[in-house]
């Protein structure tokens, strides 16, 4: 959406061969934005379907409660060792646990203590402006024309160094800007949800 004081910025993410990369988190931050964020007004959901976390990657604002319903017929024990957002939801089916509120920004790796092949991620950001790329590697952000922003991307598959995953965008005088991230390193394989060892990015 574009308002009288805002413009849509299209963000494109492509791999080292120029192919679009889907399901990449994209978010924009203004200088000092983390100090004046309003409290989230809605919760988010990460379901458990066919022994997989759905969505595999969830992006939320700091302070957002996340529900972890279990839509499978088998029990799950959901947990994370990611500091400082550690949590444990003992074995359950259905919706037996209250939402978990994530008060700290960063990457949260999610697992199941019963099914080791289950792996999901929550990216907690100090921003109200975030989304994910579609199958064409495209995401759109509605930004204030009077502000400067740092646009960043993240995915568990990306191996490029962090310094290459953020770009500054000057909105004044640049309505309808485009930002392109051309990754230089080969992506990690997508998580297939098959049995095997887990890979934790943070403990």
Identify the meaning behind each predicted range.
Residues 17-41, 73, 116-119, 145-147:
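Short, ordered, surface-exposed loop/turn motifs in non-cytosolic proteins
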């Amino acid at each position: 959406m574009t308002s009288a004081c805002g413009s849509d910025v299209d963000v494109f993410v492509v791999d080292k061969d120029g192919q679009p990369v889907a399901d990449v988190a994209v978010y924009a931050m203004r200088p000092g934005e983390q100090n004046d964020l309003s409290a989230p007004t809605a919760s988010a959901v990460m379901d458990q379907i066919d022994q997989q976390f759905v969505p595999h990657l969830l992006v939320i604002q700091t302070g957002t409660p996340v529900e972890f319903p279990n839509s499978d017929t088998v029990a799950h024990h959901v947990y994370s060792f990611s500091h400082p957002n550690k949590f444990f939801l003992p074995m359950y089916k259905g919706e037996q646990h209250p939402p978990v509120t994530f008060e700290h920004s960063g990457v949260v790796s999610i697992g199941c203590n019963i099914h080791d092949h289950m792996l999901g991620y929550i990216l907690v950001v100090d921003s109200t402006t975030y989304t994910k790329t579609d199958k064409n590697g495209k995401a759109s952000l509605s930004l204030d024309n009077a502000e400067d922003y740092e646009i960043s991307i993240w995915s568990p598959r990306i191996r490029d160094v962090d310094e290459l995953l953020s770009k500054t965008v000057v909105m004044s005088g640049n309505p309808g800007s485009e930002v392109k991230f051309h990754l230089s390193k080969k992506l990690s394989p997508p998580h297939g949800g098959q049995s095997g060892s887990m890979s934790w990015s943070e403990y």
